[in-house]
């Protein structure tokens, strides 16, 4: 919440944008590229159908916000890089990973990014695209004030508006990928706002509303993923448990808003579990 592809640098005029929790982010994008050859001893026996790569390389693209970008996690290996490398190892090919995620991005920003010739070129030759987007679209403070003592129906209008753009993003990514058996993955969120210890410090109303938004959002993302024919990955359960009550503080960076190194490892495992 990224892919033999040549990563084309994309320069976009970005504006500071607050995350759902109201925190501001840097104005720059931080792409990362990892290319490796898998030694015979590290290659899994099975090869993932549809993710065998082409030309001896499996290309992965990451798109989205500060979560896949790796914000607030110093020297982290993001889950985008982990998945891209691991899936290439499974297929006994080289890994080419282009993480085009940008801190602070909203759905509208990704839609603009998808119009860039560089992004279209990158997706055209990618075997796997991983998307995490939507959290920054929610004005959490306003929604908390309005829905603190209401049920889930109070946030549905806010979620519906975001989901329409998420659908368009996924449809455009899928259409842009021309590699045979190319795969699109979209993740949900463990929380669209702050979580763990930091989240609890914001108060019960904040925790109630952000968890409600997250559950409604994730449910709708899963539904449209099924309709469009892309892979949905539940990341809330690995972070917070089946009942949503597990303390995920150790999986988060100090800001309580982004994954820690351990959190990125958990995200990677969740994504890989959904890929054959």
Which ranges hold each PLM region?
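Hydrophobic single-pass membrane-targeting/anchoring helices
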Residues: 1-25
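Serine-esterase "nucleophile elbow" of acetyl-processing enzymes
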Residues: 26-103, 120
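Solvent-exposed loop/turn segments at secondary-structure junctions
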Residues: 66-69, 101-108, 135-140, 190-195, ...
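A structural motif corresponding to the C-terminal end of an alpha-helix
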Residues: 165-184, 216-233
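Catalytic His-Asp segment of secreted/periplasmic serine-dependent ester chemistry enzymes
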Residues: 189-276
């Amino acid at each position: 919440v990224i892919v033999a592809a040549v990563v084309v640098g994309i320069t976009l005029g970005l504006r500071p944008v607050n995350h759902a929790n109201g925190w501001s982010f840097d104005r720059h994008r931080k792409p990362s590229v990892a290319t490796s050859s898998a030694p015979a001893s590290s290659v899994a026996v099975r090869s993932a159908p549809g993710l065998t790569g082409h030309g001896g390389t499996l290309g992965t693209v990451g798109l989205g916000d500060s979560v896949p970008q790796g914000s607030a996690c110093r020297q982290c290996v993001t889950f985008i890089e982990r998945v891209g490398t691991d899936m290439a190892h499974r297929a006994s090919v080289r890994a080419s990973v282009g993480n085009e995620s940008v801190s602070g991005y909203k759905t509208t920003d990704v839609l603009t990014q998808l119009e860039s010739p560089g992004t279209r070129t990158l997706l055209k030759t990618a075997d796997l695209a991983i998307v995490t987007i939507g959290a920054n679209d929610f004005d959490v403070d306003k929604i908390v004030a309005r829905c603190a003592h209401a049920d889930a129906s109070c946030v549905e209008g806010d979620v519906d508006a975001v989901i329409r753009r998420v659908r368009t993003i996924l449809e455009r990514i899928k259409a842009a990928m021309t590699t045979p058996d190319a795969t699109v993955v979209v993740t949900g969120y463990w929380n669209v706002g702050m979580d763990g210890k930091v989240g609890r410090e914001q108060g019960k109303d904040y925790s109630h509303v952000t968890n409600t938004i997250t559950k409604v959002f994730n449910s709708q993302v899963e539904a449209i993923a099924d309709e469009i024919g892309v892979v949905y990955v539940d990341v809330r359960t690995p972070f917070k448990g089946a009942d949503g009550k597990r303390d995920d503080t150790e999986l988060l960076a100090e800001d309580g808003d982004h994954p820690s190194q351990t959190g990125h490892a958990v995200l990677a495992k969740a994504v890989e579990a959904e890929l054959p």
